[in-house]
Curated annotation (Swiss-Prot):
Post-translational modification: Glycosylated and palmitoylated by host. Glycosylation is crucial for glycoprotein export at the cell surface.
Lineage: Viruses, Riboviria, Orthornavirae, Negarnaviricota, Haploviricotina
Organism: Mokola virus
Name under which the protein is recorded: Glycoprotein
Residues anchoring lipid (S-palmitoyl cysteine): 480
Gene: G
Regions of this protein lying in the Intravirion compartment: 477-522
Amino acid sequence: MNIPCFVVILSLATTHSLGEFPLYTIPEKIEKWTPIDMIHLSCPNNLLSEEEGCNAESSFTYFELKSGYLAHQKVPGFTCTGVVNEAETYTNFVGYVTTTFKRKHFRPTVAACRDAYNWKVSGDPRYEESLHTPYPDSSWLRTVTTTKESLLIISPSIVEMDIYGRTLHSPMFPSGVCSNVYPSVPSCETNHDYTLWLPEDPSLSLVCDIFTSSNGKKAMNGSRICGFKDERGFYRSLKGACKLTLCGRPGIRLFDGTWVSFTKPDVHVWCTPNQLINIHNDRLDEIEHLIVEDIIKKREECLDTLETILMSQSVSFRRLSHFRKLVPGYGKAYTILNGSLMETNVYYKRVDKWADILPSKGCLKVGQQCMEPVKGVLFNGIIKGPDGQILIPEMQSEQLKQHMDLLKAAVFPLRHPLISREAVFKKDGDADDFVDLHMPDVHKSVSDVDLGLPHWGFWMLIGATIVAFVVLVCLLRVCCKRVRRRRSGRATQEIPLSFPSAPVPRAKVVSSWESYKGLPGT
């Protein structure tokens, strides 16, 4: 496929659009035309810097992003939750035991979590044993509480890292962001007060393993760097570059979103927050190889055209389109006026939309005004057709739009954070506060004598009150009965005696045995 290279080379433009490729190049302005001979025609070298004087090249080493580095933005880790397993038993009067199991939480420490994680990954049986529910004990008429603290490790727990600020992003974090994990605090708070997130690698040395060393050639003008050819032969200008630090490594962001790092880049402007870098993958590398091959092929076509012109001693408007500089920068423009070949030195600027240079029918905008053709001829193979339309040779290529779509689909700016603030979980409940956490032995506590009733002292007081009340009622009733008897006895003594009308014979009274013997008949 014949790939128009001028739609690809981003690094020579001066604007700061992300991921946009120049559609075309046109002179900023055209001044005086100078007649030349055919032997003065020259093909532009689009692999060199566009700036005058930046022709000296020297080899150097630079750092760029690894291909497919997005896979390294996932930071593996684990969550650590403090759990208190509790077994509570009560033995009643007849020896019946009731057991209740409970679970509470406590806030763990980083050191204890790291130890528990090492136990788990190494297969240490202590980790599994720490999660078991404690064996309950019992005591007659007492409540025995047995507790056991343990740390629950859940792994892997993957979070995303923002390579711009080395912050971690996950919905499990209270604000969606953990920004203080570097360098002194090796853990992140979560939405649960009793759960911590820790990275698998305590030193986090592998998190930013996203750079690779490459070799290129610098384009120099004295001690000043104009740009460089990367390892694939693709020229990149430092125009429009800004300083940007990734994962603690200082570097520069080129205007097309490419990030590189080398010593003394001579760039002093810091990037704004909306200037992001583009991903780097194998597909982009392949496209760059195609670009370089196509640039070379375009130059070969231009040289073939020049050879044909010199051999035939004839030049056409269409052939002049091969001599246009395909990328923004300094170059030459050619035209034919009154049968003479003309040239002028110009600076080519980028064109992103055809409407920018073709605002209306029959108008080719150069600078701030429409350029008038001479007998239907403009420059670089551009002519005005019989119907008044401006005809640009590159506009007739159907492959241009296809390749534009291909290239635009191949560039994705890396936008962070990827976590939506609305997806952040809310806090649910308060956690118990514990201090001086370690892996303790099973703890057992035995209560005082318990009769099996909740708040039995209170109920005993109520029972004693009821008994006292009943006793009091009984005493009152007894007292009331005695009082009634006394009153009834007094009423009987006050009743008057009645005498009968007939005499009642008196009984004989015998005072003693001697008197009894002296009675008649004895």
